[in-house]
Amino acid sequence: MRDDEYEAPAGGDELIPMAPREALDIWLERQEMDKAESTVQSYRYRVRPFVEYLEDEEGIENLNDLNGRHLLRFDSMRRSGGDIQKNTLNNQLGTIRQFLEFGIKANAVKPTVASQVDIPHVSKEERINREKLPTQRAKDILAFLDRYEYASRDHVIAFLLWETGARAGSLRALDLEDVYLEEDDLDRLRYQEDLGVGESVLEDILAGVELPFIYFRHRPETDTPLKKRDSGERPVNVSEELGEVLGAYIRVRRAAGTDEHGREPLLSSKKAPGRITVSGIRVRSYEVTQPCQVGKECPHDRDPEECEAREHGQKSRCPSVRSPHKWRTGSVTWHRDRGWPPEEIATKMATSVELVNSVYDQPEQLKRMAIRRENLDKLYEK
């Protein structure tokens, strides 16, 4: 498909018929060219209900017929539910506007329609979800796993989420060969042709490398893309403690096997395709953040023996659970509280300094003031 195949002809005002579902399919195909799979999936989830509404409730078979009245009724229907968050509505309607702007370029939607999408304004404070994983909770979880489930897959997942702040998709993408624990492991880098450095330069680099570390790699051709694609590829140092846990897991507790592409996943699974899924990482994150699963009393006055959140497929029903993204937010705050500059966090976690400062970093203000006090004292050191 040519890039301009569905673009409106220059100066053309005449609309060309296009069904809503056809437009959605074409638009998503175009997004796949430069967006991460997870981003395209989120676009699909946001726009598909709109398309289904147009077809089922408004009887629209041709986007030429779409007008502001249809948008108003869809908007009213979404808001009338009462349980949708303002931030969620902002994201959905913003994506729908992008979809309609594509429809305008394709001469399928009237030029004024996209601007009639009423996107609610969301302040900076409203954009930030405050449900991070607090530092003390993370430490308690890791201490429990270290004592009772040492080097288990759950221990590895939780430790990696907290110490690296990586996305779930990045953890899923790790292979055994991406884990560097001993000097001999560095030999693997000498035979990788896609590092972009000459042999002599590489040897100088390796001479100064400190172990242990992991290397996040973008491998979309075998179904493990990184959200930031090639720019998300990066080596990340890990602590000696995490390195020891990784080593013990690999030697003793990892389920042996390969995935459907013959690769050896770090986070393997006994189920096909042999590699844990992103949703699988999410479920494990939910379980280890249930207080009753890590030796704590239930803060919600529930009986663990009867709690529905203990049942298979219901882990997210516990009010205390946190997704991998909340580990990431908590990790950023932990790094900042320990004095890490935003620029270094952004590099380590493959994000932007702006996001580190505006979204991820959610400090306890008194703790952050104590850090500033240390810096103030340095001003007067002799």
Where are these predicted regions, by residue range?
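Basic, alpha-helical nucleic-acid-contacting "clamp/cap" segments
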Residues: 194-272
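Catalytic-site neighborhood detector that most strongly recognizes the C-terminal catalytic loop/helix
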Residues: 34, 349-374
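C-terminal secondary-structure termini that scaffold catalytic or DNA-interacting sites
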Residues: 2-10, 375-382
